[in-house]
Curated annotation (Swiss-Prot):
<comment type="subunit">
    <text>Monomer.</text>
</comment>
<keyword id="KW-0812">Transmembrane</keyword>
<feature type="transmembrane region" description="Helical">
    <location>
        <begin position="152"/>
        <end position="180"/>
    </location>
</feature>
<feature type="transmembrane region" description="Helical">
    <location>
        <begin position="202"/>
        <end position="225"/>
    </location>
</feature>
<dbReference type="GO" id="GO:0005886">
    <property type="term" value="C:plasma membrane"/>
</dbReference>
<dbReference type="InterPro" id="IPR002293">
    <property type="entry name" value="AA/rel_permease1"/>
</dbReference>
<feature type="transmembrane region" description="Helical">
    <location>
        <begin position="410"/>
        <end position="430"/>
    </location>
</feature>
<feature type="transmembrane region" description="Helical">
    <location>
        <begin position="338"/>
        <end position="359"/>
    </location>
</feature>
<feature type="transmembrane region" description="Helical">
    <location>
        <begin position="230"/>
        <end position="259"/>
    </location>
</feature>
<feature type="topological domain" description="Cytoplasmic">
    <location>
        <begin position="65"/>
        <end position="85"/>
    </location>
</feature>
<feature type="topological domain" description="Cytoplasmic">
    <location>
        <begin position="1"/>
        <end position="13"/>
    </location>
</feature>
<keyword id="KW-0029">Amino-acid transport</keyword>
<feature type="transmembrane region" description="Helical">
    <location>
        <begin position="14"/>
        <end position="36"/>
    </location>
</feature>
<dbReference type="GO" id="GO:0051454">
    <property type="term" value="P:intracellular pH elevation"/>
</dbReference>
<dbReference type="Pfam" id="PF13520">
    <property type="entry name" value="AA_permease_2"/>
</dbReference>
<comment type="function">
    <text>Involved in glutaminase-dependent acid resistance. Exchanges extracellular glutamate (Glu) for intracellular gamma-aminobutyric acid (GABA) under acidic conditions. The protonation states of substrates are crucial for transport. Selectively transports Glu with no net charge and GABA with a positive charge. Also efficiently transports glutamine and, to a smaller extent, methionine and leucine. When the extracellular pH drops below 2.5, can import L-glutamine and export either glutamate or GABA.</text>
</comment>
<feature type="topological domain" description="Periplasmic">
    <location>
        <begin position="260"/>
        <end position="288"/>
    </location>
</feature>
């Protein structure tokens, strides 16, 4: 049976050090068009999600991650130890499954960029063309990862700087020049438009995109154990991350919102739309650079998708290690890639992609359903995280931990309940059709989302119920936790949701 090796970690991670290894999560360029559809109120949504959801998740996860014996294993360990192994298995499964669906909006963004580069609109508009192209890209990227992940983190680092950070900086700079020139602005930015119109429920649906942008912080919580002064530095690091996310996402989203009217924003290609308008206004003689920027964005998101293919499956591998999955899922190739888990995830992605792209028309509705489905699946894991934390506070107050949410039991419960209620609110509004989906499409939106969610929701519980867990998974594999001292180069440029939590050690070789 696979085993886990505990490695000593020097407690030398500072506030800025922790911020640096977590900061990659605040850049979400492919979500900017969705943010922009809410106009100036996107700032309100970012503040709401940051204060009422991101901070509670970060604080609750950090305390659970520092309980003696729970330092490794993440959500699986925390939920298993508070609610039981069935729920722990479900929680980590939802984290694995949401990645499978989360690939779809990212692939749509890639196709949007590629359609601009090749001047081939059908690639972003025709469902069949879109489906075939997305499947080819997905499986081609997967093939690059089956050979091992030795260079994945380095590729992600280059992709982050050249394909995400640089285009985002150019977008913001062009938008600033556009605004300074006195060009017409598509939105109003004042105290009235700061708040969304709460009388229109459809306007609140976009909140799910903002929640998605904050998801994944719990994956970095284990590094709290490496901090020299977690009680002081960790809450400050969370505040810094929230401020950085709000500032960058606000500027990025508003750069699109003030240039493209909300009802004209293409969620897959909105960034390229914006670059086209900005460049034609600021420097029409070099409008060809839009295709260069599109290529950078394309490479950035391709690198991101590639880096997400193996990491979550390695995280899920801990369940195969504990024989909560059939033995076939414990299979590793010679390069340390859990091939059955990876292929299973990509098969789910492929099936969902085919259904959503062709049933939803391959347009904004497909993008929105994929986005909402990703969020509601992941929220199921967060429900368990918050409930597990409440159980920890009420039933296990004496368990030793190195970080405590300051303020005592009452404050801890308030933080967890606020996070849980915000999760429930986001979950409910996810099933409401957005304002830009009208007529018969609203019924199709709800039906597709509900049916898809129920199918995915049932998978972990069915698998847990039918699998005989009495045997042992004889894998001959050792898991060595990754920390800030032994992490591979470029590891922390990956989004926390995409990082492998441990090395795979086989035949004395570390992968």
């Amino acid at each position: 049976m696979a085993t886990s090796v505990q490695t000593g970690k020097a407690k030398q991670l500072t506030l800025l050090g922790f911020f640096a290894i977590t900061a990659s999560m605040v850049m979400a360029v492919y979500e900017y068009p969705t943010f922009a559809t809410s106009g100036f109120s996107l700032v309100f949504f970012l503040l709401l999600g940051g204060i009422l959801w991101f901070i509670p998740v970060g604080l609750c996860a950090a305390e659970m991650a520092t309980v003696d014996g729970w330092e490794e294993g993440g959500v699986f360990a925390w939920v298993s130890n508070t609610l039981g192994p069935r729920w722990g298995f479900a929680a980590i499964s939802f984290g694995y499954l949401q990645i499978a669906i989360g690939f779809i909006p990212m692939l749509y963004f890639v196709l949007g960029a590629l359609s601009y580069i090749l001047k081939w609109p059908a690639l972003n508009e025709d469902p069949i063309t879109k489906t075939i192209a997305a499947l080819i890209i997905l499986w081609a990227l997967a093939l690059t990862q089956f050979g091992g992940t030795k260079y994945t983190a380095r590729i992600a680092k280059v992709g982050f700087f050249a394909g995400i950070l640089l285009p985002a900086f150019i977008l913001i700079a062009l938008a600033a020049i556009y605004l300074h020139s006195g060009a017409p602005v598509a939105i109003e930015m004042d105290s009235k438009t700061f708040f969304p119109d709460f009388s229109k429920v459809g306007t609140l649906v976009v909140f799910v995109a903002f929640i998605l942008s904050y998801m994944g912080v719990e994956a970095s919580a284990t590094h709290v154990n490496e901090m020299s002064n977690p009680g002081r530095d960790y809450p400050l690091a969370m505040l810094l991350l929230m401020v950085a996310a709000i500032c960058l996402s606000s500027v990025g989203g508003l750069s699109i919102a003030m240039v493209i009217p909300g009802n004209e924003i293409n969620l897959s290609a909105g960034v390229m739309q914006t670059f086209t308008v900005l460049m034609s206004h600021v420097a029409p003689e070099i409008e060809w650079t839009v295709r260069v920027i599109s290529a950078l964005l394309l490479l950035g998101v391709l690198a991101e998708i590639a880096s997400w293919i193996v990491g979550p499956s390695r995280g899920m591998y801990v369940t195969a290690q504990k024989n909560l999955l059939p033995a076939a899922f414990a299979k590793m190739n010679k390069n340390g890639v859990p091939v059955t888990l990876v292929i299973s995830q990509l098969v789910i992605t492929s099936i969902a992609l085919i259904i959503l792209t062709n049933t939803g028309g391959g347009n904004n509705m497909s993008f929105l359903i994929a986005l909402a489905l990703t969020v509601v699946i992941y929220l199921c894991a967060y429900f368990m995280l918050f409930i597990g934390y409440i159980v920890l506070v009420l039933k296990h107050p004496d368990l030793k931990r190195t970080f405590n949410i300051p303020g005592g039991k009452g404050v801890k419960l308030v933080v967890a309940i606020v996070g849980l209620l915000t999760s429930i609110m986001a979950f409910i509004v996810s099933f409401l059709p957005p304002d830009n989906i009208q007529g018969d499409s609203t019924d199709m939106y709800v039906e597709l989302l509900v049916v898809s969610f129920l199918v995915v929701l049932a998978l972990p519980f069915i698998l847990y119920a039918v699998h005989d867990r009495k045997g042992k998974a004889n894998t001959g594999v050792t898991l060595e936790p990754i920390n800030s001292q032994n992490a591979p180069k470029g590891h922390f440029f990956l989004h926390p949701r995409a990082r492998s939590p441990h090395y795979i050690v086989m035949n004395d070789k570390k992968h």
